[in-house]
């Protein structure tokens, strides 16, 4: 096989690179650091490049039965010398001050342009506040910067209480009270946590509500449903007012009716707990039954209770017979007055009936009666006779009719006034 490897760079006789097959922009050469596309002066030292294209021998080669002839190096040199000179050339040797290896410094420093000729550059509103010498600005502030004060937060271990994870269900009143005493003695280590405070407040409210509930046995576990039932019963009993026919609530929650006037005078305080109130009512019922059997004449028993639930004193009063004022005595004078008014009215009606002559009662006309008895002036028109005619011309008859109606209205007004003033 023929040797297709390129010769070493020492065999190169020219400083320029041969023309490449593809087109590459000059800017891409400048960015990559390949400045060998420029024609270097004769005084420049020899700079071997890794981008040199391989030079092939002048001997013709056969590739798959075809003869390929490569151009000679002398022809390449003559072609490059006859070509026009490029526009750009390197005036100074490139310096390498960048920390990145192989990257030369820029030929034109844009910061120098902004400092020397600031009027040529239009400042944008986004870059107005940025200083020109940004590196110096950062370096000056970096030396005089105050170190930041770091606050090391203390990581507290969560002291989880196992009682908070369990459901809120007290085993007994004694265990609940001991637990609450222990909670009061403990300091609030987790005061910053909001959830622990909320749970503690709920437990405290539950303890205060369950403390006054009647518990049958201390050792036996109680169901919270039973406690809620008893609390509802006690709240209903506290809202009820004690009446002559009141009720007694025992520990089992049943309501037993008590007939009689034995709980009329029972005095109790609303601040007393429900358990003491129920116990006092049970004791009162038993004492009432005993007293009823011993002394059936006792009318009422008065019993006072203190806030502690202890009975202060009890009294037993015997009934005494008293003369009750009857209801009719209050209206005796009213009835006597009304009866006297009615009697007087009857007497006046009888007198008027006696004064009416027989001719008018028989139905004879009024002018005949006037002719027969002209001297009689006391003529009264009968109100009950419909057949008797009324003489409108006679003034005497109209005045008598008005007097009679006025008397009746006056009697009715007096009777009504008496009843109104008495009430």
From Swiss-Prot:
Keywords: Cell wall biogenesis/degradation, Cytoplasm
Spans through the membrane: none
Biased composition (Basic and acidic residues): 392-405
Annotated spans, Disordered: 1-25, 46-69, 156-178, 369-405
Comp. bias (Pro residues): 1-10
Gene Ontology cellular component terms for the protein in this record: cytoplasm
Cell wall biogenesis/degradation listed as a keyword: yes
Superkingdom of the source species: Eukaryota
Subcellular location: Cytoplasm
GO biological process terms, semicolon-separated: fungal-type cell wall organization
Miscellaneous comment: Present with 259 molecules/cell in log phase SD medium.
Physiological role: Involved in cell wall composition and integrity and response to osmotic stress.
Protein name: Protein HLR1
Species of provenance: Saccharomyces cerevisiae (strain ATCC 204508 / S288c)
């Amino acid at each position: 096989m023929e040797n297709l490897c390129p010769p070493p760079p020492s065999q190169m006789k020219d400083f320029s690179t041969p023309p490449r097959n593809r087109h590459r922009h000059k800017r891409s050469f400048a960015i990559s650091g390949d400045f060998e596309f420029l024609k270097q002066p004769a005084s420049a030292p020899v700079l071997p490049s890794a981008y040199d294209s391989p030079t092939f021998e002048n001997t013709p080669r056969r590739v798959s039965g075809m003869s390929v002839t490569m151009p000679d190096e002398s022809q390449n040199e003559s072609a490059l010398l006859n070509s026009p000179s490029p526009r750009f050339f390197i005036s100074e040797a490139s310096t390498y001050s960048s920390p990145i290896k192989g990257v030369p410094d820029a030929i034109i420093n844009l910061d120098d342009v902004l400092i020397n000729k600031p009027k040529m550059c239009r400042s944008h509103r986004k870059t107005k506040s940025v200083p020109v010498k940004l590196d110096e600005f950062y370096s000056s502030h970096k030396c005089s910067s105050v170190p930041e004060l770091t606050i090391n937060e203390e990581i507290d271990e969560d002291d989880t209480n196992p009682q908070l994870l369990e459901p809120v269900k007290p085993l007994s009143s004694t265990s609940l009270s001991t637990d609450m005493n222990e909670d009061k003695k403990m300091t609030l280590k987790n005061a910053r946590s909001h959830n622990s405070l909320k749970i503690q407040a709920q437990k405290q409210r539950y303890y205060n509500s369950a403390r006054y509930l009647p518990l049958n046995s201390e050792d036996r576990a109680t169901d919270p449903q039973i406690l809620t039932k008893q609390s509802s019963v006690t709240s209903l009993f506290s809202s009820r007012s004690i009446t002559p026919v009141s009720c007694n609530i025992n520990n089992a929650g049943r309501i037993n009716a008590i007939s009689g006037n034995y709980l009329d005078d029972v005095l109790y305080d609303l601040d007393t707990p429900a358990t003491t109130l129920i116990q006092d009512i049970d004791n009162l019922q038993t004492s009432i039954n005993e007293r009823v059997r011993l002394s059936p004449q006792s009318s009422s028993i008065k019993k006072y209770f203190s806030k502690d639930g202890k009975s202060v004193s009890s009294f037993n009063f015997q009934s005494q017979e008293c003369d009750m004022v009857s209801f009719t005595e209050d209206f005796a004078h009213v009835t006597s007055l009304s009866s006297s008014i009615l009697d007087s009215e009857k007497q006046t009606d009888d007198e008027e009936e006696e004064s009416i002559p027989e001719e008018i009662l028989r139905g004879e006309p009024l002018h005949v009666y006037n002719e027969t008895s002209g001297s009689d002036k006391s003529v009264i028109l009968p109100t009950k006779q419909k057949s008797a005619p009324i003489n409108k011309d006679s003034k005497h008859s109209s005045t008598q009719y008005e007097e009679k109606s006025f008397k009746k209205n006056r009697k009715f007004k007096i009777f009504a006034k008496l009843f109104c003033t008495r009430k």
